Protein backbone atom coordinates (compact mmCIF):
# COMPACT_ATOMS: atom_id res chain seq x y z
CA UNK A 1 0.00 0.00 0.00
CA UNK A 2 2.94 2.37 0.63
CA UNK A 3 3.97 2.13 -3.01
CA UNK A 4 0.39 2.94 -4.04
CA UNK A 5 0.50 6.05 -1.83
CA UNK A 6 3.77 7.10 -3.50
CA UNK A 7 2.08 6.72 -6.89
CA UNK A 8 -0.82 8.93 -5.77
CA UNK A 9 1.55 11.61 -4.41
CA UNK A 10 3.51 11.55 -7.66
CA UNK A 11 0.29 11.90 -9.62
CA UNK A 12 -0.75 14.91 -7.53
CA UNK A 13 2.56 16.62 -8.37
CA UNK A 14 2.18 15.68 -12.02
CA UNK A 15 -1.38 17.05 -12.21
CA UNK A 16 -0.36 20.29 -10.49
CA UNK A 17 2.26 20.79 -13.21
CA UNK A 18 -0.03 20.06 -16.15
CA UNK A 19 -3.00 22.09 -14.95
CA UNK A 20 -1.60 25.53 -15.69
CA UNK A 21 -3.36 28.23 -17.68
CA UNK A 22 -0.49 28.62 -20.18
CA UNK A 23 -0.50 24.97 -21.30
CA UNK A 24 -1.90 24.26 -24.73
CA UNK A 25 -5.07 22.11 -24.87
CA UNK A 26 -3.23 19.33 -26.76
CA UNK A 27 -0.66 18.92 -24.01
CA UNK A 28 -3.35 19.03 -21.35
CA UNK A 29 -5.21 16.20 -23.15
CA UNK A 30 -1.99 14.17 -23.42
CA UNK A 31 -1.29 14.77 -19.72
CA UNK A 32 -4.79 13.61 -18.81
CA UNK A 33 -4.32 10.41 -20.87
CA UNK A 34 -0.99 9.69 -19.15
CA UNK A 35 -2.61 10.37 -15.77
CA UNK A 36 -5.45 7.92 -16.48
CA UNK A 37 -3.02 5.22 -17.63
CA UNK A 38 -0.90 5.61 -14.49
CA UNK A 39 -3.99 5.41 -12.26
CA UNK A 40 -5.20 2.25 -14.04
CA UNK A 41 -1.77 0.63 -13.72
CA UNK A 42 -1.60 1.56 -10.03
CA UNK A 43 -5.02 0.07 -9.36
CA UNK A 44 -4.14 -3.05 -11.33
CA UNK A 45 -1.02 -3.51 -9.20
CA UNK A 46 -2.96 -2.94 -5.98
CA UNK A 47 -5.63 -5.50 -6.82
CA UNK A 48 -3.83 -8.02 -9.03
CA UNK A 49 -0.14 -7.61 -8.21
CA UNK A 50 -0.60 -8.65 -4.58
CA UNK A 51 -2.11 -12.07 -5.35
CA UNK A 52 -0.38 -15.09 -3.91
CA UNK A 53 1.30 -17.59 -6.21
CA UNK A 54 -0.63 -20.87 -6.63
CA UNK A 55 1.08 -24.27 -6.60
CA UNK A 56 -0.09 -27.87 -6.34
CA UNK A 57 0.98 -29.79 -3.25
CA UNK A 58 0.55 -33.43 -2.30
CA UNK A 59 -0.15 -34.49 1.29
CA UNK A 60 -0.27 -38.26 1.64
CA UNK A 61 -2.39 -39.19 -1.39
CA UNK A 62 -4.26 -35.86 -1.53
CA UNK A 63 -3.60 -32.97 -3.92
CA UNK A 64 -4.35 -29.36 -2.96
CA UNK A 65 -4.14 -26.09 -4.87
CA UNK A 66 -2.12 -24.05 -2.41
CA UNK A 67 -1.62 -20.31 -2.24
CA UNK A 68 1.98 -19.59 -1.30
CA UNK A 69 2.56 -17.04 1.45
CA UNK A 70 5.97 -15.79 0.31
CA UNK A 71 6.45 -12.34 1.83
CA UNK A 72 6.34 -11.49 5.52
CA UNK A 73 3.12 -9.54 4.91
CA UNK A 74 1.52 -12.53 3.18
CA UNK A 75 2.66 -14.84 5.98
CA UNK A 76 1.26 -12.50 8.63
CA UNK A 77 -2.08 -12.23 6.83
CA UNK A 78 -2.44 -15.89 5.87
CA UNK A 79 -6.13 -16.71 5.40
CA UNK A 80 -7.36 -13.79 7.54
CA UNK A 81 -10.37 -11.75 6.43
CA UNK A 82 -11.66 -14.40 4.03
CA UNK A 83 -15.06 -15.99 4.34
CA UNK A 84 -14.08 -19.48 3.21
CA UNK A 85 -11.56 -21.74 1.49
CA UNK A 86 -12.41 -24.17 -1.32
CA UNK A 87 -12.26 -27.83 -0.24
CA UNK A 88 -9.28 -28.61 -2.50
CA UNK A 89 -7.44 -25.39 -1.58
CA UNK A 90 -4.83 -24.59 1.06
CA UNK A 91 -2.41 -21.93 2.25
CA UNK A 92 1.27 -22.94 2.18
CA UNK A 93 4.02 -21.37 4.30
CA UNK A 94 7.69 -22.23 3.68
CA UNK A 95 9.95 -20.74 6.34
CA UNK A 96 13.19 -21.91 4.75
CA UNK A 97 14.61 -23.13 8.04
CA UNK A 98 13.36 -25.02 11.06
CA UNK A 99 11.84 -23.13 13.94
CA UNK A 100 8.92 -23.01 16.33
CA UNK A 101 6.71 -20.63 14.37
CA UNK A 102 3.50 -19.86 16.24
CA UNK A 103 0.19 -19.24 14.48
CA UNK A 104 -2.86 -17.34 15.64
CA UNK A 105 -6.33 -16.87 14.20
CA UNK A 106 -6.43 -13.07 14.02
CA UNK A 107 -9.02 -11.98 11.46
CA UNK A 108 -10.04 -15.56 10.66
CA UNK A 109 -13.69 -16.13 9.78
CA UNK A 110 -13.69 -19.92 9.52
CA UNK A 111 -11.99 -22.83 11.34
CA UNK A 112 -8.95 -24.63 9.90
CA UNK A 113 -6.60 -27.56 10.41
CA UNK A 114 -2.95 -26.52 10.74
CA UNK A 115 -0.54 -29.14 9.37
CA UNK A 116 3.00 -28.87 10.78
CA UNK A 117 5.71 -30.14 8.38
CA UNK A 118 9.41 -30.83 8.93
CA UNK A 119 11.66 -31.99 6.08
CA UNK A 120 8.55 -32.85 4.01
CA UNK A 121 7.04 -35.11 6.68
CA UNK A 122 3.96 -34.21 8.75
CA UNK A 123 5.01 -33.99 12.40
CA UNK A 124 1.74 -32.69 13.83
CA UNK A 125 -1.78 -31.54 13.04
CA UNK A 126 -3.71 -28.93 15.01
CA UNK A 127 -7.28 -29.98 14.19
CA UNK A 128 -10.42 -27.85 14.09
CA UNK A 129 -8.77 -24.61 15.18
CA UNK A 130 -11.76 -22.29 15.70
CA UNK A 131 -12.13 -18.79 14.31
CA UNK A 132 -12.17 -16.26 17.15
CA UNK A 133 -15.35 -14.51 18.16
CA UNK A 134 -15.55 -11.17 16.31
CA UNK A 135 -14.16 -8.38 18.46
CA UNK A 136 -11.75 -10.60 20.40
CA UNK A 137 -8.72 -8.46 21.28
CA UNK A 138 -5.37 -9.58 19.86
CA UNK A 139 -4.02 -10.09 23.37
CA UNK A 140 -6.71 -12.72 24.03
CA UNK A 141 -6.01 -14.81 20.92
CA UNK A 142 -4.56 -18.27 21.49
CA UNK A 143 -1.21 -19.05 19.88
CA UNK A 144 -0.75 -22.47 18.27
CA UNK A 145 2.74 -23.99 18.19
CA UNK A 146 4.11 -27.08 16.44
CA UNK A 147 5.05 -30.14 18.51
CA UNK A 148 8.66 -29.71 17.34
CA UNK A 149 10.68 -27.39 15.09
CA UNK A 150 9.15 -27.23 11.60
CA UNK A 151 10.04 -25.61 8.29
CA UNK A 152 6.64 -25.63 6.55
CA UNK A 153 2.95 -25.27 7.37
CA UNK A 154 -0.16 -26.10 5.36
CA UNK A 155 -3.55 -24.69 6.38
CA UNK A 156 -6.68 -26.49 5.16
CA UNK A 157 -10.38 -26.45 6.04
CA UNK A 158 -11.22 -27.73 9.52
CA UNK A 159 -11.96 -31.44 9.69
CA UNK A 160 -10.46 -32.13 6.28
CA UNK A 161 -7.38 -33.87 7.69
CA UNK A 162 -9.64 -36.45 9.38
CA UNK A 163 -11.98 -36.71 6.38
CA UNK A 164 -9.08 -37.36 3.98
CA UNK A 165 -7.06 -39.53 6.37
CA UNK A 166 -4.12 -37.12 6.59
CA UNK A 167 -1.95 -38.11 9.55
CA UNK A 168 1.40 -37.63 11.25
CA UNK A 169 4.10 -39.41 9.22
CA UNK A 170 2.49 -38.67 5.84
CA UNK A 171 4.75 -37.13 3.22
CA UNK A 172 4.39 -33.64 1.78
CA UNK A 173 5.62 -32.62 -1.66
CA UNK A 174 5.24 -29.83 -4.19
CA UNK A 175 3.79 -31.27 -7.39
CA UNK A 176 4.68 -28.41 -9.75
Which residue ranges define each predicted feature?
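Compact, glycine-rich, soluble single-domain proteins
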Residues: 2, 29, 40-176
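N-terminal Lys/Arg-rich, disordered targeting/topogenic segments
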Residues: 1-28
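Hydrophobic H-region at the start of alpha-helical membrane spans
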Residues: 27-37
